[in-house]
Amino acid sequence: MRFFSRLRTGFAFARRSTRVLRDHPRLAVLPAVAGVAGLLYVAALWGVVFAVTPSPDQPVMVVALLALYFGSTFIASYFTAALMFCAKQTFDGAEPSIREGLRAAGRNIGPLLAWAAISAVVGVIIRMIEENDSLPAQLVAAVFSVAWGVLTYFIVPVIVFEDVGLTEMFARSKQTVTRTWGESLGAAGGVGLVTVALVIAGALPGIVLLFALPSLGLLAFALIVVGVLLAGLAGQTLTGIAKTALYVYATEDETPEYFDGIDFGDSGDGGSGGSGGLSGRFPGSGGIVGRKS
């Protein structure tokens, strides 16, 4: 029954993350800005590529793909770092400050750029492997992609909260995942299912209108797009909040505010309110490791 226990923990994380977002809706501003900035970057990049080379060859496409992955990863990571800093403020009982979150991300712009560059190279390698249609290549690409995602799951909170070098930040992310894999899997699954439910709920009014009044198809389509975008925005924000809570749990001696009552150790909801974090798993870690001021 461990699967259902993890799933209960995941839904508990999703509920508590929703409470955080409900009490502090301004947190959604950061993923929204990230989405707009990312779209503008992609549009500008491809505009330049096709303006300079109307029929780009493979070397040009590889460079363009590197630039695409690099810029997209940096933008997403920068605003995610700001979101996580703000989420941590709410866990400390303070009012989140978007300005302070952006400043915290700005202080770590070097590591974020390095992370984006490494991620871009890995992304292009995976993409090149995927272009081989053979089954072994597809399997290698899939395994490589999953392993990379697991290894770097906590890379952004490590960057924003810890003073570590390039190699160490990957080691710290891996260590945190290794010691909280069950909780991380449950939280990701719970928030993912909630996001799917939000997408369905967001698209439903437009779908109903489309079938009820086909003549208003354009309006119905607009409602569907807006509903799905808002649901995706909420899902991204909830993911950032839940991941920050997991990270704080892994590095502090207390369960984050809003997440009291979740028995992390048993992966259930409503057990021992103070599980004591993972300070026992991280020897000598009282509070966030190497906390940045």
Residue ranges and their predicted role:
Residues M1-S293:
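Hydrophobic alpha-helical membrane segments
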